[in-house]
Structures are given as C-alpha cells and as structure tokens.
Regions:
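Conserved long hydrophobic alpha-helices within structured protein cores
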Residues: 70-78, 159-165
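Central antiparallel beta-sheet cores of small beta-barrel/beta-sandwich binding domains
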Residues: 76-149, 155-157
Length: 199
C-alpha cells in the first residue's frame, strides 16, 4: 500500500510540474547571426522557456562601475537576474543584467537617478551577447527620443575596466511640447565610448 501511495504521489508531483525547456545565451547569440533570421526566425529555439547563462558570461559585468565623460560623473550598478521575467505572464524567462544609473553634472548635482527603481522600472536591461559585447537597452528621457542600445564589454587584459557605448535610436514621434529643447538636448549617456572602472 505504501508503494502505491508513493507512486501516486510521485506521479501527481511530476504532472503538476511544468517542465522548463532550457536554452543558452550562446544559442540565442548564434540565432541573431543567422543570415535569414529576420524572415525565418529560429524555429529550433521556439519551444525554449528559459534562456540560461550556462557559462556565467554575465558575471563579469556584475558590480558597481564608475567613470566620467563630457563633464558628468557616472555610477552604473549592474545586477544579474536569474530566470527573470519582465511580466509573470511572459512565456520565456532569461538570465540577464538589469542596470541602474546615477549621473551627476560637474557641480555634483544629480541629473538622472534610477538607483532606487524596481527592476521593471530601471529601463536599462540586457538582451544578449554580440561576440564579446553584451547588448543592453536604455530608455532615458523618451519625450526627447532618448532610447537606444548600450554595448558593454570588459577589457581582456583588465577585467576591472569596462567599455560602454551608447547608440541612440532617435526612433519615435517627437512632440515638441514635451521636449521643447530637442535641437540642443544632450542625452544622459555619452555617444562616444566611455571607460568605467569596477569599484
């Protein structure tokens, strides 16, 4: 009787657990390089429910980084999130980097701060690798069309230094009433490569 009860309990546990189909960041990086990806997608990866950092490539970015550019001081805090979903209803979860940024002007005045924002509200999150660079997406002042890709990469000979490059999209519809100074607006992140040092 005990064996039957054990088998029945085990069977119910197995049925109630929804199996995760695990893929790797490397598989999704390879998918992004396929010549016909825009048309064909990556059908071999469609059933994956969790994109895992199996080789711990994200770990090199975790920590607090500081640097300066164009008279501004930057503090960037990067955290690795495991099995992360933006929304509980998302079909797929990822191991990814979530970033927070503190920017001060030359007088020490805070001009941007997402340090106390929830993970979902930092608007600075990772996507995937492109060779050695990790691709993230940043949204600053969206009313002034400040959004785009951020590429981060630690140096091979000095893993305590990281290059950060911001490529602003400038996509969207500009409403001059919400960004009256658009012609002179300077994005929060520099559009030239910036070097940050791990603290």
């Amino acid at each position: 009787m005990k064996n039957r009860l054990f088998i029945l309990t085990l069977f119910l546990i197995i049925i109630s657990c929804k199996a995760q189909v695990i893929g790797t960041l490397e598989q999704f990086e390879e998918c992004s390089k396929r010549p016909n990806r825009d048309q064909d997608g990556c059908p071999d990866l469609e059933n994956i429910t969790y994109v895992k950092d199996t080789n711990n490539r994200l770990d090199q970015f975790v920590g607090t980084w500081k640097g300066s550019a164009n008279g501004k001081q930057y503090e960037v805090k990067l955290e690795k999130k495991i099995n992360y979903k933006d929304d509980p209803s998302d079909v797929r979860s990822f191991d990814r980097i979530i970033g927070r940024i503190l920017i001060k002007d030359s007088s020490g005045n805070i001009i941007y701060n997402s340090m106390n924002k929830s993970d979902k509200d930092t608007y600075f999150f990772g996507d995937n690798f492109q060779n050695r660079s990790y691709l993230m997406y940043f949204v600053g002042n969206y009313n002034c069309l400040e959004a785009g890709n951020v590429f981060i990469e630690t140096r091979i000979n000095n893993p305590n230094e990281m290059k950060l490059f911001y490529s602003q999209d400038k996509d969207g519809i500009l409403n001059p009433a919400k960004c009256p100074n658009f012609s002179t607006y300077v994005p929060f992140l520099p559009t030239q490569t910036m070097i940050l040092t791990k603290q």
